[in-house]
Amino acid sequence: MKGIMEQGAYTVLTKLQKQGYEAYLVGGCVRDKQLHRPVKDYDIATSAKPEQVLDLFERTIPTGLQHGTVTVVLGAHHYEVTTFRKEAAYEQFRRPAEVQFIDSLHEDLQRRDFTMNAMALDQHGNLIDPFGGLADMEHGLLRCVGDASERFTEDALRMLRCIRFSAEYGLEVEAATWKALCEHSLLLKHIAMERVRMELERMIAGADPVKALGLLVSSGILRETKQALKLAQLNPQHMPAAIHLLLESDARWTYLFLSIGLNAAEIEADMRVLTFSVDQIKRVYKAAAAFYMLREGLLLNQDEYVQEPALEKKLEHLWKLGALTYGKAAWLTIYNILAVEPRWMESHGITVEAGSIVLSRGKEWLDALIVDSLKQLQVGGKELLAHMNNKSPGPWVTEVLNHLLQETALGRLPNETCLLIAEAEQFVKYHNL
Ligand code: ATP
Ligand code: MG
C-alpha cells in the first residue's frame, strides 16, 4: 500500500502525463524504495518546462527556476519537480550555476552521480535503470555513472557524497570509482568549506561514521580541503570506535576530536574553519575543555590520591568545578562518551579507576550541585556593592561572585544572602581586593 506522500507523488506524475509531458520519480526516492528503506522525499523529473509546471498546479513555489525546479504543494506534502536537464559546462570543479533543459530522461539520468541515484520509476511503477543501479546495489557496490574520473572532475563534492553513501548504505566503493576518487582527491580544494562540513556532518550523524572516517583516511581526502583542518591528522589508530552508539551530534564530534588528541583551542579552530554554528562550537569546545581540566587536575599532585577515597574526592571536586566553569552539559557529553566506551579515558591519560568512578558517580555529582550559575546565587553584584561601603565597581565583583558560587556549589557555604555577604567581606579583606 502506498502512503499519502507517495500517492501524492503519483498524482503529480499522472497530471503531468495527462498534459502530454513525460514525468518520473527519480533519485533518492527510487533508490530507497528499491531498498525498502523509508523515503524522505519524492523528487520528480519531467519534460515540462518550469513555467508549464507553474501553470499546471494550483499551489507551487518557484524554488530554483534557473535550475528548472518548481516545488508543487499537495496537502501537507512538497514535491520538487525538475525539468530534464544536463549540466552543460562545469566550472571550477563545481556544479554549474546554469543548466540546459533537454527532452530526454536518459540524458537527465546520465548527469547524476552514482548508478543507484540514476534510476527512475514511471507512473505504473516500472523501473528505468539504464546504468545498472539495481544490480550494483544487489552486489553491494557504489559506482559512478559512466567514467568516474570525469564525474569527480565535473563536481568534486561527489567524492564526499561517495564516501557518505558508501558508509550510510554499507556499500563497497567499486574499484574504478575508488581509484578515481583517490586520484582526484586534491580537487576538493575547490569546494566551499560549508559544503564540506555539511557532508561531514551527515557522515558523522549517519549509520556508520567509523566506516566513513576510514574511507576519509584511506583516500587522504581530508588533507585536500580548501582550508587546512587538524581533523586531517585522523589515522586508523585513533578511530572513535563506539561513535555510532552516541545519540547526539555534539557528543559524536567531541568524541571524534578528542580521539585525535586535539586540544580545545584546536577543536574550536577546526570547527570555525568548517563553519559550524557558533553555538555548536561553544558546546563542543566546553566539553573538550572540561575533559582536559579533569585530566590536568588529576595529573597534579598525583601521589596524594592513589587511594580510592582520596581519588574519588578529588574527582568529585574537579567534576563540580568543571560544571561551574563549563556548564553541566559539558559533563553530560563527556559522561555519554565514557558510557559508550568505558575504556576510552584510559588511552587519553585518565586511569580506568578514575573513569569508572566518574561513570558511577558523575550524574549524582551533577544533581548534587545546588547552584551552578551566578544567577542562582542569593546575592548579586548590586547587592554586593551596596554592602561594601566605599568600594567602587570593578573586576573584584566578578571575582568575589565566582568565589561565592564555587563555595556554595561545593557545599561549603549555604546559599543564604547574609552568609554570602559575610563570606564576601572576609574574602575581600583576605585577598586585599
Ligand atoms: P539524500 O537526500 O538521502 O542525501 P538523495 O539521493 O536524495 O539522497 P540529493 O542530494 O537529495 O540526494 O539529490 C537528489 C538526486 O540528485 C540524487 O539522487 C542524484 O541523482 C542527484 N544529485 C544530487 N547531487 C548530485 C551531484 N553533486 N552530482 C550529481 N548528481 C547529484
Ligand atoms: Mg534527497
Question: Where are the regions that the model predicts?
Answer:
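Catalytic cores of the polymerase beta-like nucleotidyltransferase superfamily
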Residues: 1-433
